[in-house]
């Protein structure tokens, strides 16, 4: 080649590459597909896993301070279960849980306390089938992995894990051990969420195109929990990350509406965070100037907003805000070609409505229908029709907690697949990590790992089941 100027060529090539990146013809590194780790040598998919039937589900609890104590109460009222052991590092809450079990006329569970790793002693018992894990977030993944390694099913509070690596470790362990690992997303068992799932399955909204999910819940008051309870550890996550810290409550139901991991999956997301102002202002107002809460650097944006694109092209907005003064909301919005359902407050607008078309005619989608009575009558989920009164009587966020636990036990006792599997927990939880990565990279898109390793293409959609 004559008259080749290497410096000029490299300069021109660099400019061309930059132009291709900004034009979208070449993806930035953050949007490149993530390398899928190899399948474990002795593992296989747990999609639709059916475990051997358990006539009695023998339970061990790890963590009974707040959520875990509520689970203990519910398990005392479930048929076909035995509470064998309870573990907590706090002797006071451990004794409280054991005393409650005994007060119900049930056998006294064995107690485990001591170090943060004492739970491993409990997991070595051969008379426990499942472990219920309700501990601070950073313990969820290691405890779930240890549970499965000890030949037990793991049921974990949200979120499932706090890193992409932990998500893969949990998936790999589940596939190798062939044990269930379910992240206990209770909101999927709410009456409204179950009704909407039933409506989606019946085609009421047409083809789905968009969803909106959120966890908007003012929790600044937890900053006053200094020595124990949720605020003693959750507050510090606002100083460590800047993204969606808690995505699953809103995202879980919307994912099931859209058959995520069962015919569609998350492809990539982009995220933005607002300024982080509210917690520092609250600390300044509520605590002395030299208080430890005023020495923290709160970096997590008060409002986190993510947009997810699925492989089928659908979009999902996911928000997180536990700081600003505003009413509670999970959004719970699902939009289809025939109309929309939105929550908080519940309302429906359809182009072809089974009610408005007959009564008034014309286009009913220009006005919200906020009277849910007839919608419940027509579309209440069979589970809620059969178990709703018992769920409400036992309580737990309007009955969703009890119904979730009841359904878990039912599936284990009847050799049926669980409603949520390890792939769901990983996909919903990893938004936490990916949103932070996007925020830190000027909101560039970040690709979701395919935790199913392609099994989402043939996964069976969650059915409408009864009791």
UniProtKB/Swiss-Prot annotation:
GO MF term set: hydrolase activity, acting on glycosyl bonds; nucleotide binding
Cofactor annotation comment: Binds 1 NAD(+) per subunit. The NAD(+) cannot dissociate.
Cofactor: NAD(+)
Family: Belongs to the Gfo/Idh/MocA family. Glycosyl hydrolase 109 subfamily.
Annotated binding of substrate, by residue: 215, 234, 246-249, 328
Family matches, as NCBIfam families: TAT_signal_seq (TIGR01409)
Function description: Glycosidase.
Residues reported in the UniProt entry to bind NAD(+): 66-67, 88, 137-140, 157-158, 186, 246
Domain of life (superkingdom): Bacteria
InterPro entries cross-referenced by the UniProt entry: Gfo/Idh/MocA-like_OxRdtase_N (IPR000683), Gfo/Idh/MocA_oxidrdct_glycsds (IPR050463), Glyco_hydro_109_C (IPR049303), NAD(P)-bd_dom_sf (IPR036291), TAT_signal (IPR006311), TAT_signal_bac_arc (IPR019546)
Cited PROSITE patterns: TAT
Signal peptide limits: 1-31
EC number(s) from the headed UniProt entry: 3.2.1.-
SUPFAM superfamilies: NAD(P)-binding Rossmann-fold domains
Protein name according to UniProt: Glycosyl hydrolase family 109 protein
Maturation and modification: Predicted to be exported by the Tat system. The position of the signal peptide cleavage has not been experimentally proven.
Gene3D superfamilies per record: Dihydrodipicolinate Reductase, domain 2, NAD(P)-binding Rossmann-like Domain
Protein keywords: Glycosidase, Hydrolase, NAD, Signal
């Amino acid at each position: 080649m004559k008259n080749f100027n290497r410096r000029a060529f490299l300069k021109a090539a660099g400019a061309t590459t930059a132009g291709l990146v900004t034009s979208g013809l070449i993806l930035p590194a953050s949007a490149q597909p993530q390398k899928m780790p190899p399948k474990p040598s002795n593992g296989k998919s747990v999609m639709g896993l059916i475990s051997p039937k358990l006539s009695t589900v023998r339970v061990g609890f790890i963590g009974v301070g707040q959520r875990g104590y509520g689970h203990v109460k519910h398990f005392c009222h479930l048929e076909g279960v035995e509470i064998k052991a309870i573990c907590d590092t706090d002797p006071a809450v451990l004794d409280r849980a054991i005393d409650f079990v005994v007060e119900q006329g049930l056998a006294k569970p064995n107690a485990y306390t001591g170090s943060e790793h004492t739970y491993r002693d409990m997991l070595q018992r051969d008379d426990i089938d499942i472990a219920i894990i309700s501990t601070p977030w950073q313990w969820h993944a290691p405890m779930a992995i240890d549970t499965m390694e000890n030949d037990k099913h793991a049921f974990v509070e949200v979120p499932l894990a706090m890193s992409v690596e932990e998500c893969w470790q949990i998936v790999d362990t589940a596939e190798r051990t062939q044990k269930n690992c379910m992240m206990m997303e209770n909101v999927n068992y709410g009456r409204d969420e179950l009704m909407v799932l039933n409506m989606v399955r019946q085609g009421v909204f047409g083809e789905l195109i968009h969803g909106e999910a959120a966890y908007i819940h003012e929790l600044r008051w937890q900053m006053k929990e200094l020595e124990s309870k949720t605020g003693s550890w959750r507050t510090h996550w606002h100083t460590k990350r800047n993204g969606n810290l808690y995505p699953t409550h809103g995202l879980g139901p919307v994912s099931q509406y859209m058959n995520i991991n069962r015919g569609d999956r998350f492809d990539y997301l982009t995220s933005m965070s607002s300024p982080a102002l509210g917690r520092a202002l609250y600390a300044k107002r509520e605590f002395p100037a030299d208080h430890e809460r005023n020495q923290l650097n709160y970096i997590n944006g008060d409002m986190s907003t993510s947009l997810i694109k699925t492989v089928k092209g659908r979009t999902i907005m996911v928000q997180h805000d536990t700081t600003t003064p505003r009413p509670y909301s999970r959004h719970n919005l699902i939009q289809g070609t025939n109309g929309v359902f939105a929550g908080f407050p519940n309302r429906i607008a359809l182009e072809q409505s089974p009610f408005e078309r007959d009564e008034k005619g014309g286009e009913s989608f220009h006005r919200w229908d906020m009277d849910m009575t007839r919608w419940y009558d027509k579309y209440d989920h069979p589970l809620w029709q059969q178990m709703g009164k018992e769920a409400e009587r036992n309580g737990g966020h309007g009955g969703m907690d009890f119904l979730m636990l009841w359904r878990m036990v039912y599936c284990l006792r009847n050799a049926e697949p669980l409603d949520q599997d390890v792939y769901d927990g990983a996909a919903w939880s990893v938004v936490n990590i990916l949103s932070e990565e996007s925020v830190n990279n000027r909101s560039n898109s970040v690709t979701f790992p395919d935790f199913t390793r392609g099994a989402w293409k043939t996964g069976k959609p969650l059915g409408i089941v009864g009791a």
